[in-house]
UniProtKB/Swiss-Prot annotation:
Organism name: Methanocaldococcus jannaschii (strain ATCC 43067 / DSM 2661 / JAL-1 / JCM 10045 / NBRC 100440) (Methanococcus jannaschii)
Gene Ontology molecular function: any one: ubiquitin-like modifier activating enzyme activity
InterPro entries reported in the protein's UniProt record: ThiF_NAD_FAD-bd, Ubiquitin-activating_enz, UCP006529_dinclt
Classification via Gene3D superfamilies: NAD(P)-binding Rossmann-like Domain
Listed CDD domains: E1_enzyme_family
Domain of life of the native organism: Archaea
Name by which UniProt lists this protein: Uncharacterized protein MJ0693
Amino acid sequence: MNAFFEGVQCSLINFNNFAKNYYTFLLKKFCLDGIFMNVEEMERKLKPKGEVSIIGCGRLGVRVAFDLLEVHRGGVEKVYVFDNAKIEENDIVHRRLGGKVGEYKVDFIKRFFGNRVEAFRENITKDNLHLIKGDVAVICIAGGDTIPTTKAIINYCKERGIKTIGTNGVFGIEEKIKVCDAKYAKGPAKFLNLDEEGHIVVGTEKFIRDFEPITPYTLDEIAKRMVIECLRILWSKYYKS
């Protein structure tokens, strides 16, 4: 009799151990499956969304384009690039990225990124503002008096709900890059004389009269900050729950 009960007790212990192990296995399996399903679902949702116009594809604009279009698991779906200039020998960053001398800067960006880019061999002026489209316009125009054109772009975009990001000085040897609303800018952007908030500017706050150079590492950092601000706008519109 004792042997019988000992056998039953041993069987129960073995069954309990088996049940415990099987329960642990099922728990892990279903938990892991649930996690994997959630990750896959989130990955499907993190598709590129929104459209951005990059106005000017010189040394700064091309950096913005490449940084923005390299973003994955989200980011921008379509980019419109505007510039009528061709790559020259001194356009080091374009050549370093694979551009060819004599090639239109916008065509180079289009060639690199394909259908995600629509290229316009035109400079944006007061006469063709209607070409600007999307959720955000990043203004990277340079050379001469850019204030009138920049202000026209800002006003046009504001009327249509397009957010704008621009520069506030690109000169400087070792300057901290600052981001602020143009209404409160202390650098070149203050000459926009904007009465209302909404136009974001990024830069060193240095003027050409400061007689400091434009360095590649400064442009890298300005482009980085511009892309961050652009992504924040897109995230707030398309991803924020």
